[in-house]
Amino acid sequence: MTRFVVVVGTADTKLDELVWLKCCLLLAGVDSIIIDVSTSILGKNHQNKKSLQVAEYHPAGADPVFCGVWNKAITVMSVALTTFLNSSIDDIAGVIGIGGSGGTEMITPAMQSLPIGLPKIMVSTMASGNTSAYVRASDIAMLYTVTDLNGLNRISRSVLSNAANMMAGSVNYFTPLANIHKPTLGLTMFCVTTPGINQTNIKDYLAVVQIITCELSLIVEPKLIINKAWQQAERIF
């Protein structure tokens, strides 16, 4: 089976935008399916997976999704979408979502659950602000809509076309992660700690008896790190 891009959004409010994205992907030579995550059932027929079908992936079934309480419904649908995407992960080449505040809050947690390297683009009205809650420790690319997503216009067509072409490029020139079975060490850095975290002295860090966290290392004099004075640094703790 050919892998496809998942185009996800609420078809009850953004069907035109979803269909536009699908058409743009088709023009770029990429197969895609539309996944509806509406929390109301309006019986539209243009999407490949209707909201009821996605909602049934929730552990408690579809009923909690269509509870009529907006903030609860998007939280529950997000859980269902997460399960749905992960159950189909072998067939998915990428995920592109569109949404306002509610749609972004619903779609991005599901994206976060997907493997690093799988292309993920969120076209959102929220992308011009603090996006940390939407991205977290994932590789989601956020693209600002400029306008509200409430029907197609010359600006939204341009933004959505760019998003589709970004996804097409990511899919057509996809580079898989190297399959290296080695232990992985994660280090972080902040300002004055940067000189201590690089490839040239990483082995020295592994030799330190005590772990110096990012927060605690802020009280270590930079010269101790630069001069690799690990014993002196350890005495601070």
Question: Residues of each region from the PLM?
Answer:
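N-terminal phosphate-binding or glycine-rich loops at protein starts, especially the Walker A/P-loop
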Residues: T2-L42, G94, T104-K120, S124
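Short glycine-rich or small-residue beta-strand-to-loop segments that form or flank ligand, phosphate
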Residues: F4-T10, P64-N71, D91-G99, S124, ...
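Generic secondary-structure signature for well-ordered alpha-helical cores
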Residues: T13-D16, C23-D31, T83-D90, Q112, ...
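Glycine-rich phosphate/diphosphate-binding loop of Rossmann-like nucleotide-binding domains
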Residues: K14-C24, I33, T39-L52, I180-V220, ...
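Phosphate/nucleotide-donor binding subsite
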Residues: N45-D90
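Cap/lid and interdomain-hinge subdomains that line or gate substrate/regulatory clefts
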Residues: A62, F66, N130-V192
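Glycine-rich phosphate-binding loop
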Residues: D90-G103, W230-F237
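Short, acidic/small-residue loops that bind anionic groups at enzyme active sites
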Residues: M106-V135, Y144, T213-L218
